[in-house]
């Protein structure tokens, strides 16, 4: 699919995008691993369910990526524990408040640097991976600063940071809880469509943590 746009001065630009259409994914109870790669990622912690998740991950010898926040400061010590157990600790947001972090580039990076300082205090290392609250293509940010995501993506990359989105959602971020069984089904169904899956879960949701076990 090719797009052509022009501005008021008559400057024109074209872009070509490949759009892939897949058949609907059939409901599945298990995944035939084959050559699939699945990355488990957990946002918004650490919180009161993170310790239990860490123990489950140890049980199955699985390593994940935690995109951490400071929204539950009483659990900051678990950031160190995540790193100690061999997981990747990455930046999500200190506040996770869209109406603050997306008001300007300065506000975003102030929040990012605050969270990185917390991570470094706990682990001894700077984080090199981030996940934008809402993802890199979120639409909520335009309510506060239209066009900011394009600039932030460029700025983050220029700073040598890697930003990570997801292509499989567990569905656990809804306003109301869903069952552990539904989280499991959402993930199993979602990974069928990808050879490489990045799964989004939240370790502040007990029903989602329970899905791991």
Residue ranges and their predicted role:
Residues 22-132:
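Active-site beta->alpha N-cap acidic-glycine motif
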Residues 8, 16, 24, 28, ...:
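Compositionally biased, intrinsically disordered low-complexity segments
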Residues 8-10, 33, 194:
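Surface-exposed coil/turn segments at beta-strand junctions on protein surfaces, enriched
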Residues 74, 96-213:
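Catalytic domains of cell-wall/extracellular-matrix polysaccharide-remodeling enzymes
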């Amino acid at each position: 699919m090719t797009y052509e746009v022009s501005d008021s001065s008559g400057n024109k630009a074209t872009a070509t995008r490949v759009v892939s259409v897949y058949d609907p994914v059939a409901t599945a109870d298990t995944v035939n691993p084959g050559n699939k790669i699945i990355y488990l990622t957990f946002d918004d912690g650490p919180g009161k369910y993170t310790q239990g998740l860490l123990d489950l991950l140890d049980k199955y010898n699985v390593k994940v990526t935690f995109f951490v926040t400071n929204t539950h400061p009483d659990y900051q010590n678990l950031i160190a524990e995540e790193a100690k157990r061999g997981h990747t600790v990455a930046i999500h947001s200190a506040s996770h408040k869209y109406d603050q972090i997306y008001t300007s580039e300065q506000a975003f990076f102030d929040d990012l640097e605050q969270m990185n300082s917390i991570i470094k205090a706990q682990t001894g290392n700077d984080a090199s991976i981030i996940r934008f609250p809402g993802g890199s293509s979120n639409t909520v940010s335009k309510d506060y600063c239209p066009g900011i995501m394009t600039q932030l993506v460029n700025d983050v990359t220029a700073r040598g940071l890697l930003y990570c989105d997801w292509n499989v959602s567990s569905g656990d971020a809804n306003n109301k809880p869903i069952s552990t069984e539904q989280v499991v089904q959402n993930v199993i169904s979602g990974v069928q469509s990808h050879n490489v899956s990045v799964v989004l879960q939240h370790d502040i949701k007990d029903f989602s943590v329970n899905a791991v076990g």
